[in-house]
C-alpha cells in the first residue's frame, strides 16, 4: 500500500514565465525569463540586446567631436554626465587644461542631471509599486530642469553641451537667477514626495527587506553608485577621485545600512538634497572668464570672429570636418553618474578618430545581479527590484 502511494506522488516542475519586453515595468526592452516555484522566484534570466545599436563601433568611424552626441543617447535620462566622462577622457589624452568657469558650469549641470535622473527613477519605481501621484508631481519639477537644458544648449534632451576643452557656449542671461529660485523651492517638493512615500505603510511593506545586497556581494558583482552606497559602502567618485571642481564642493555621501530597496530609495532622496547644496555652491563661486580651452587646435573660433576673418572660417570648417589629432595614448576615465560609475576607456592611435572606445555602463553590471537579488522573493517583488536598480537600456545594450 505504501509503495502504491509513493508512486502516485507526482513531481511538480517549476513554472517558466516570460516577463517583457513589452511590459510597462520592464523599463525599456528587458526580456526576463523567470523560473517560478509557485509564486516564488527560483531563477531570473535577463535577456538583453534588443536595443543594441553598435555605439562603440560607430564611434570608431567618427572624429572625436562627432562621437560626442552618441553619449547623450546611451543613458538618455542622465545625458550631460556621460558627455562629461567622454570629454574628460579626451582632455586627458590631449593634456588639455579646462578654464575654471567651464569646470563650474560642468559640475552645475552634472548635478542638475543627477536630480533629473533621480526624480524619474524614484517616481517610476513608485508607479511600478502602485503610487501614481509622485510621478505626476515630479514631472512638473523635471520640466523646469529640462527648460534649463534647453536654454543653455537649445535641446531638451540630447544637449551635446559639455565638450572636450570646456562647454559649447556660455550661460545665457538670468539663467543663474532662475536656477537659484528653483533650488530654493525644490527642497519643499522633495518633502512633499517624502510625505507620500517614506513612512507610508504600503511603501515600506513593499520595499523593506526586499532585494538585500551585502557589501561583499556588491563588490563581487561590480555594483557602484546607489546600489553600492545602499549596502553601507561610502564610495562616491566625486569624493574619492574628484574631477573638475568637486574637490572644492562641500557635501555628504548618503549611505544605507541594510542594503535593501528601502535604503536605496532613501539614498536617492538624500542625494537630490545634496545636489541642491552643490548647485548653490557652484552658483555662489562661479568665476568670470573663458568657457573653452585657449587651444586653437581644439577650440573653434567664435561666431563673431568667423564673420570678420576668412582664416577663422577655414579653421572652423576644418575643425568640424577633419577634427583634431590626438597623440598615441590610452586612458580610462570615470565619473559618478546618477546610476553609478560611468567609465570611458579610450584608445588613440594618433589620428583624428578613436581607435577603440569601451564604455563601462553601470546598468549593465547591475542587471546581471538581478538573479542574485530576486532569488526566493515573490513575483511582485521582481518589479520592485528592477525599479530600484534604475535600469535604462540605452546604456545596457549600447
From Swiss-Prot:
Subcellular localization(s) per the UniProt record: Mitochondrion
InterPro entries cross-referenced by the UniProt entry: NADH_Q_OxRdtase_suD (IPR001135), NADH_UbQ_OxRdtase_49kDa_CS (IPR014029), NDH1_su_D/H (IPR022885), NiFe-Hase_large (IPR029014)
Cofactor note: Binds 1 [4Fe-4S] cluster.
Reaction equation(s) it catalyzes: a ubiquinone + NADH + 5 H(+)(in) = a ubiquinol + NAD(+) + 4 H(+)(out)
Listed Gene3D superfamilies: Cytochrome-c3 Hydrogenase, chain B (1.10.645.10)
GO terms under cellular component: mitochondrion
Pfam families: Complex1_49kDa (PF00346)
Keywords on record: 4Fe-4S, Electron transport, Iron, Iron-sulfur, Metal-binding, Mitochondrion, NAD, Oxidoreductase, Respiratory chain, Translocase, Transport, Ubiquinone
GO MF, any single term: 4 iron, 4 sulfur cluster binding
SUPFAM superfamilies, per the entry: HydB/Nqo4-like
KW S-adenosyl-L-methionine (keyword) present: no
HAMAP family given in the database record: NDH1_NuoD
NCBIfam families (UniProt xref): NuoD, PRK06075.1
Subunit (UniProt): Complex I is composed of about 45 different subunits. This is a component of the iron-sulfur (IP) fragment of the enzyme.
Protein family according to the UniProt entry: Belongs to the complex I 49 kDa subunit family.
The protein's name in its UniProt record: NADH dehydrogenase [ubiquinone] iron-sulfur protein 2
Source organism phylogeny: Eukaryota, Viridiplantae, Chlorophyta, Nephroselmidophyceae, Nephroselmidales
Protein encoded by which gene: NAD7
Amino acid at each position: 500500500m505504501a509503495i502504491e502511494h509513493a508512486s502516485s506522488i507526482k513531481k511538480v516542475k517549476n513554472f517558466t514565465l516570460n516577463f517583457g519586453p513589452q511590459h510597462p515595468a520592464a523599463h525599456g526592452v528587458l526580456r526576463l525569463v523567470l523560473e517560478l516555484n509557485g509564486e516564488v522566484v527560483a531563477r531570473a534570466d535577463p535577456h538583453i540586446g534588443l536595443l543594441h545599436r553598435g555605439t562603440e563601433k560607430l564611434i570608431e568611424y567618427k572624429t572625436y567631436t562627432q562621437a560626442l552626441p552618441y553619449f547623450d543617447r546611451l543613458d538618455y535620462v542622465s545625458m550631460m554626465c556621460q558627455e562629461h566622462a567622454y570629454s574628460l577622457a579626451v582632455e586627458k589624452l590631449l593634456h588639455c587644461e579646462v578654464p575654471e568657469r567651464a569646470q563650474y558650469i560642468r559640475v552645475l549641470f552634472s548635478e542638475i542631471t543627477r536630480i533629473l535622473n533621480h526624480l524619474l527613477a524614484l517616481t517610476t519605481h513608485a508607479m511600478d509599486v502602485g503610487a501614481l501621484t509622485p510621478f505626476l508631481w515630479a514631472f512638473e519639477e523635471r520640466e523646469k530642469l529640462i527648460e534649463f537644458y534647453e536654454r543653455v544648449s537649445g535641446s531638451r534632451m540630447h544637449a551635446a553641451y559639455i565638450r572636450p576643452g570646456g562647454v559649447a557656449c556660455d550661460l545665457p542671461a538670468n539663467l543663474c537667477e532662475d536656477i537659484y529660485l528653483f533650488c530654493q523651492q525644490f527642497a519643499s517638493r522633495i518633502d512633499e514626495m517624502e510625505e507620500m512615500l517614506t513612512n507610508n505603510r504600503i511603501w515600506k511593506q513593499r520595499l523593506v527587506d526586499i532585494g538585500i545586497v551585502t557589501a561583499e556581494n556588491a563588490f563581487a558583482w561590480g555594483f557602484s553608485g546607489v546600489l553600492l552606497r545602499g549596502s553601507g559602502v561610502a564610495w562616491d567618485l566625486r569624493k574619492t577621485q574628484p574631477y573638475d571642481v568637486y574637490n572644492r564642493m562641500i557635501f555628504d555621501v548618503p549611505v544605507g545600512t541594510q542594503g535593501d530597496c528601502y535604503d536605496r530609495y532613501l539614498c536617492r532622496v538624500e542625494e537630490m538634497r545634496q545636489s541642491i547644496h552643490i548647485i548653490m555652491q557652484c552658483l555662489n563661486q562661479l568665476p568670470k572668464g573663458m568657457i573653452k580651452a585657449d587651444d586653437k587646435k581644439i577650440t573653434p573660433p567664435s561666431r563673431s570672429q568667423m564673420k570678420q576673418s576668412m582664416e577663422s572660417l577655414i579653421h572652423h570648417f576644418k575643425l568640424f570636418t577633419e577634427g583634431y589629432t590626438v597623440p598615441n595614448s590610452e586612458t580610462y576615465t570615470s565619473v559618478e553618474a546618477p546610476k553609478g560609475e560611468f567609465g570611458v576607456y579610450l584608445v588613440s592611435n594618433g589620428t583624428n578618430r578613436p581607435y577603440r572606445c569601451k564604455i563601462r555602463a553601470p546598468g549593465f553590471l547591475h542587471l546581471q545581479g538581478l538573479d542574485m537579488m530576486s532569488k526566493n522573493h515573490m513575483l511582485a517583488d521582481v518589479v520592485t527590484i528592477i525599479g530600484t536598480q534604475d535600469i535604462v537600456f540605452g546604456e545596457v545594450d549600447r
